[in-house]
């Protein structure tokens, strides 16, 4: 049975970038990776209500730069930048020997961000809202924002059923095999009284076409 590859991982180096932008030798690689994981988990937990879509980490010598993509930048920045300073102080406990820089990037259309959509559906499931209603409402809002297509899947003991199953809804087109297609992917888990329910969201935002270089006139080139 064929399994779906992660849409972001498939397109890295083609139309997508790495979420971790650094290089380390064999000796330091594992430590850096563990640090990255701790930083991501902490920032995600700290800014749970701020709608954090993704966190990019850049490293250079003794410096770490975090690019935090969020739908509500004001909730992270705080009054007069107090939130940023408090976050830096907390992160210093994880990486005490490094200088931390934080850059906040606003997610303009939260309704079209796959990760935020998945987390929104998961939150509704935890509030005992019907999974079908949650998925359909999220899809409708996403399509109104001007995207080309969206697909959502919920897996687990849906509606408290004895046997776990998966249900999907989609609208528009989702060309998962087309490498130039800009596919955004998000995953979240809902902790319900019946157990965990996994939520996956695929969003198709259109094709990313390579920039064509202007062809020089042959006669001008000869001259």
From Swiss-Prot:
<dbReference type="GO" id="GO:0003729">
    <property type="term" value="F:mRNA binding"/>
</dbReference>
<dbReference type="InterPro" id="IPR036419">
    <property type="entry name" value="Ribosomal_S3_C_sf"/>
</dbReference>
<comment type="subunit">
    <text>Part of the 30S ribosomal subunit. Forms a tight complex with proteins S10 and S14.</text>
</comment>
<dbReference type="InterPro" id="IPR005704">
    <property type="entry name" value="Ribosomal_uS3_bac-typ"/>
</dbReference>
<dbReference type="InterPro" id="IPR009019">
    <property type="entry name" value="KH_sf_prok-type"/>
</dbReference>
<dbReference type="Pfam" id="PF00189">
    <property type="entry name" value="Ribosomal_S3_C"/>
</dbReference>
<keyword id="KW-0689">Ribosomal protein</keyword>
<keyword id="KW-0687">Ribonucleoprotein</keyword>
<dbReference type="Pfam" id="PF07650">
    <property type="entry name" value="KH_2"/>
</dbReference>
<comment type="similarity">
    <text>Belongs to the universal ribosomal protein uS3 family.</text>
</comment>
<keyword id="KW-0699">rRNA-binding</keyword>
<dbReference type="GO" id="GO:0022627">
    <property type="term" value="C:cytosolic small ribosomal subunit"/>
</dbReference>
<dbReference type="InterPro" id="IPR015946">
    <property type="entry name" value="KH_dom-like_a/b"/>
</dbReference>
<keyword id="KW-0694">RNA-binding</keyword>
<feature type="domain" description="KH type-2">
    <location>
        <begin position="39"/>
        <end position="108"/>
    </location>
</feature>
<dbReference type="GO" id="GO:0003735">
    <property type="term" value="F:structural constituent of ribosome"/>
</dbReference>
<comment type="function">
    <text>Binds the lower part of the 30S subunit head. Binds mRNA in the 70S ribosome, positioning it for translation.</text>
</comment>
<dbReference type="GO" id="GO:0019843">
    <property type="term" value="F:rRNA binding"/>
</dbReference>
<dbReference type="InterPro" id="IPR004044">
    <property type="entry name" value="KH_dom_type_2"/>
</dbReference>
<dbReference type="InterPro" id="IPR001351">
    <property type="entry name" value="Ribosomal_uS3_C"/>
</dbReference>
<dbReference type="GO" id="GO:0006412">
    <property type="term" value="P:translation"/>
</dbReference>
<protein>
    <recommendedName>
        <fullName>Small ribosomal subunit protein uS3</fullName>
    </recommendedName>
</protein>
<dbReference type="InterPro" id="IPR004087">
    <property type="entry name" value="KH_dom"/>
</dbReference>
<dbReference type="InterPro" id="IPR018280">
    <property type="entry name" value="Ribosomal_uS3_CS"/>
</dbReference>
